[in-house]
């Protein structure tokens, strides 16, 4: 049970998969460490007071991706792809990977300064927040990334009330209103 969860959001993201172990990698060499790319949903539990991203983003079903990897050689320009998402067939997000705040080589270089990356590690590149909205039990999430394909995920379990959309500064309920969801 995650206390004080008011709403869950799913953010459509472009993610990359590491090909080999990486530590202290320069930006110039970083793309040599990329094996391929996957569609990725970054799910967040909103409404709780956060001390870190671990609890609101780190639940075991909160990072559905794949189910396939498109290899790096199939995507000559990872910064020129459209990312789209739908919830129950309703369009939610539509943005270009060219709008990413941090490029892949920058992300690999920065993360590898602080931790050892391993083959198969998946790093999501972030999202464009326009169109993000609540998700609930029974919903179907879809993500499509140009040249990578389209994936579908289903939400099961309990979820917060459908009538709440928490925004910063709003009053939060005194009691928890939701329990974890599972995305399959």
Regions found by a protein language model. Name each.
Residues 26-38:
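Short Gly/aromatic-enriched secondary-structure transition segments
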Residues 1-8, 14, 22-29, 52-57, ...:
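A generic local secondary-structure boundary/capping motif
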Residues 8-12, 33, 63, 79:
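Short, basic and Ser/Thr-rich N-terminal targeting/leader segments
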Residues 46-184:
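Catalytic-pocket segment enriched in acidic/His residues
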Residues 10-20, 38-43, 69, 87:
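Short, structured patches in soluble enzyme cores that scaffold and shape functional sites
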């Amino acid at each position: 049970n995650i206390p004080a969860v008011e709403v869950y959001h799913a953010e459509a993201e472009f993610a990359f998969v590491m090909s080999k172990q990486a530590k202290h990698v320069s930006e110039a060499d970083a793309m040599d460490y990329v094996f391929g790319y996957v569609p990725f949903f970054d799910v967040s539990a909103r409404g709780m007071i956060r001390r870190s991203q671990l609890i609101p983003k780190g639940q075991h079903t909160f990072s559905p991706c794949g189910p396939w990897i498109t290899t790096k050689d199939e995507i000559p320009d990872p910064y020129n792809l459209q990312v789209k998402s739908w919830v129950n067939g309703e369009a939610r997000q539509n943005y270009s990977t060219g709008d990413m705040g941090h490029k892949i080589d920058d992300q690999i270089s920065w993360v590898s300064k602080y931790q050892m990356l391993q083959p198969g590690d998946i790093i999501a590149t972030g999202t464009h927040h326009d169109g993000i909205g609540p998700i609930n039990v029974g919903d179907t999430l879809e993500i499509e990334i140009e040249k990578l394909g389209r994936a579908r995920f289903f939400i099961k379990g309990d979820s917060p009330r459908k009538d709440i959309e928490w925004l910063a500064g709003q009053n939060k309920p005194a009691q928890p209103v939701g329990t974890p969801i599972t995305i399959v």
